[in-house]
Amino acid sequence: MHGLTNVEGEGVVLKLEDNEEQQITSNHLLKLVNDLKYAGAEAISINENRITNFTDIVDVNYVIMINGIKISSPYEVKAIGNQTYLSSTLNAKDGFLKTYKETGVTITMSEEKNIKILKYNRELKLKYGSSNY
């Protein structure tokens, strides 16, 4: 999941919205990203921010930040991969949809044939490593 190229293909699109009873947090999005990776997603984006192996998803003063970029509800999560695997993993007994729909969060999911996810458009910075060897 380096995210260095634009990709397109089949997959799923989820829309998540806060409501008066439940606010979506970085933990919700991290669980969703992990479930999608487990299901074999080849590319993932949240509100058009490409998810890579280096992506940070954190809460800062009740605001979700992805790699230092503020995002807000509604959240659109796109995942490219085998639709059957993605859908069945998210709908499994302990999957994201079953777990979080019970909390009152508004979630919809659709299977789509032609999803486009743009490449990661920022510089990848390594703290301890170097690509100049």
Predicted regions and their residues:
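Core subunits and conserved enzymes of cellular information-processing
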Residues: 1-133
